[in-house]
Regions:
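C-terminal active-site/capping subdomain that shapes the small-molecule cofactor and substrate pocket
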Residues: 187-194
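NAD(P)-binding Rossmann-fold cofactor-contacting core
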Residues: 1-15
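Hydrophobic/aromatic beta-strand patches that form the interior of the parallel beta-sheet core
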Residues: 10, 55, 73-75, 100, ...
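Rossmann-like NAD(P)(H) cofactor-binding subdomain of soluble oxidoreductases
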Residues: 38-88
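Rossmann-like NAD(P)-binding element
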Residues: 14-48, 52-53
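Short, well-ordered alpha-helix to beta-strand connector turns
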Residues: 6, 25, 51, 96-97
Length: 194
């Protein structure tokens, strides 16, 4: 609020869990570590099947299980950074990047269109539809495994007690960048996407 980045905030996720609170809210985007996504969806069950659309930003989808919902579309913006927090905010982060949408709950078309419009129009992203299984397999290979290898490599170098800094090439620098990503988020991803 102080930086004029958001118009309104809530102190607790429990504030959201009422039809009265969300009656004037079009879209709620959950941006939490992957292991927290299911729990947050469960805690806001009063918002299920309302006119408010719910989406997430989790890099893993197979663990999200919801029954009888018509307003939840899963999203995965493919636009990240090894930096996190408000100090790492980048207004151009999403422009021309891809966002994967999954609709495992066969939600009402209006909710799918609302989520797609949000990512395309508000954030200038390109969207692609995948099944949950396809999403998790593709990103296990193209994102999750490379991050896992980077953590393992950097840890191996650290444990070797060798100073390789003067001999490090561009490839190692990319692994260093990847291994600098948020460890809580990546730990969740590795555990959830097996």
């Amino acid at each position: 609020l102080k930086r004029n980045i958001i118009d309104e905030c809530v102190d607790s996720i429990d504030q959201i869990n009422s039809k009265e609170f969300v009656k004037n809210i079009d879209l709620i985007v959950l941006a939490v570590p992957p292991k927290q996504t299911q729990g947050i969806f469960n805690r806001i069950d009063e918002v299920w099947n309302t006119d408010t659309t719910l989406t997430d930003t989790s890099s893993v989808k197979n663990h999200i299980k919801l029954d009888n919902v018509s307003n939840v579309i899963l999203s995965h913006p493919i636009a990240g950074s090894d930096k996190s927090g408000i100090s790492a905010a980048n207004e151009n982060l999403f422009i021309n990047k891809k966002n994967i949408l999954c609709d495992p709950f066969n939600s009402d078309k209006i909710h799918f269109e609302k989520v797609e419009k949000f990512w395309k129009d508000a954030l200038q992203m390109k969207t692609n539809l995948m099944t949950v299984n396809e999403h998790d397999l593709v990103f296990a290979m193209t994102s999750h495994l490379p991050h896992l290898v980077s953590y393992a490599l950097i840890d191996s170098i650290r444990l070797s007690n060798h100073d390789v800094g003067d001999n490090a090439g561009g490839g190692l620098k990319e692994f260093l960048r990847l291994s600098g990503s948020n460890p809580e988020m990546w730990s969740d991803i590795f555990v959830l996407n097996r």
